[in-house]
Regions:
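Conserved beta-strand termini and adjacent loop/short-helix elements that scaffold enzyme active sites
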Residues: 2-9, 73-75, 143-145
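Acidic/histidine-rich catalytic neighborhood of metal-dependent amide-processing enzymes
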Residues: 13, 37-132, 149-154
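N-terminal hydrophobic or amphipathic helices/low-complexity stretches enriched
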Residues: 20-25, 218-219
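Short connector loops/turns at beta-strand edges and beta->alpha or beta->beta junctions
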Residues: 24-26, 34-37, 109, 172-176
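Active-site-adjacent substrate-binding region
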Residues: 113-222
Length: 222
């Protein structure tokens, strides 16, 4: 994996980790996941389940032609208030913001089938994910998490008027099980079949986003 850099973040001991996969145009798709965790549990679900997939998505995209430059980012200190993503988003220049067609945020995967935080996701990006899932015959559903006080790194990009989507696996069942931010957050909490389906869906989805221009039209399902 080439083009890896570390971005020192003011106030954080650990940097953001950034990997760029250059495309043939100046347009950009950001794919992000935080790698930090709270002290309770192992942090497997929240959020190594997401951060550990970033290299796999890179490998899946690197050998095919693509117009967009994909920027994969492991964000630091999300659990401290989206510190890493806030720093990254705020240091983006106006030209960088204008060039960014989408920000795909991954947080807490593998508790069950793929979910989307619909109320905090761009409708066009959400529609494109649903169409991809339909094409692959894979499950996806909308579950909003703001009512439990949740937030995530995608919100920092929304403040810069960048289209974003947050993909997760949270549900009422998972909430009732009290897995997140507890000692139950360990490998045994991951439902591997659901996790693999989420990976398949996201790998295809990220590739399909390259078809989009700045207006992000929804591609025709086939």
């Amino acid at each position: 994996m080439q083009n890896i850099s570390e971005q020192q973040v003011k106030g954080s001991k650990l940097p953001n980790v950034i990997c760029m996969l250059p495309g043939s145009s100046d347009k950009v798709i950001i794919v992000g996941a935080h790698f930090d965790r709270v002290s309770e549990g192992d942090g497997v679900v929240d959020n190594w389940s997401s951060a550990s997939l970033l290299p796999s998505f890179y490998e899946g995209l690197k050998n095919g032609p693509h117009k967009h430059t994909y920027i994969f980012i492991g964000f630091t200190d999300e659990e401290q208030g989206e510190v890493g993503s806030r720093f990254y988003a705020r240091q983006m220049t106006k030209d960088q913001v204008a060039a960014t067609d989408a920000m795909v945020n991954l947080d807490t995967l593998g508790l069950g089938p793929t979910k989307v935080w619909v109320s905090h996701s761009d409708k066009r990006l959400t529609d494109a994910l649903v169409q991809t899932a339909t094409r692959l015959n894979l499950p996806v559903a909308g579950v909003n998490v703001e009512q439990i006080g949740a937030s995530s790194d995608g919100e920092q990009f929304a403040e810069r008027k960048i289209a974003r989507i947050t993909i997760h696996s949270f549900s009422q069942e998972a909430f009732n099980a009290r897995i997140i931010h507890t000692s139950k957050d360990k490998l045994s909490a991951i439902r591997l079949d659901d996790y693999h389906q989420t990976y398949r869906l996201l790998a295809t989805y990220l590739a399909s986003l390259d078809q989009f221009g700045g207006s992000l039209p929804v591609p025709t399902a086939h």
